[in-house]
Amino acid sequence: MLDSLKQKKNFQRIKMRIKTGDLVKVINGKDKGKTGEVLKTIPLENRVVVKGINLRTKHVKPTQEGETGRILTEEASLHASNVMFFSKDKNLTSKIEYFIDKEGVKKRRLKKTGEVID
């Protein structure tokens, strides 16, 4: 699927404000209201994988004789628009904005409270 995205003429990589390791809250879908840590971001598809959210079961056939099949549960990706950054300290969700501090370093902060993330 990634190859087909790259072959499009007007293809642009989407800038994601959510990073790996951020705590996010699901704002839409079957897991609405749950919070979890971002395990992986997929910027080419604008998707994120969140720990313990959007679980899928996968049935694996045995590969060798004497081995039994297994049922695995793994996290599937969510669209980035369905999650929002969650602040544990303030217990609220907020959009993220970028700013440049006095030393000239680009940082992220919450739009609602102004709390600096990193």
Swiss-Prot record:
Keywords: Ribonucleoprotein, Ribosomal protein, RNA-binding, rRNA-binding. InterPro entries: KOW, Rib_uL2_dom2, Ribosomal_uL24, Ribosomal_uL24_CS, Ribosomal_uL24_KOW, Translation_prot_SH3-like_sf. GO terms for cellular component: ribonucleoprotein complex; ribosome. GO terms for molecular function: rRNA binding; structural constituent of ribosome. It comes from the Bacteria. GO terms for biological process: translation. Belongs to the universal ribosomal protein uL24 family. Part of the 50S ribosomal subunit. One of two assembly initiator proteins, it binds directly to the 5'-end of the 23S rRNA, where it nucleates assembly of the 50S subunit. One of the proteins that surrounds the polypeptide exit tunnel on the outside of the subunit. PANTHER family: MITOCHONDRIAL RIBOSOMAL PROTEIN L24. This is Large ribosomal subunit protein uL24. The gene is rplX.
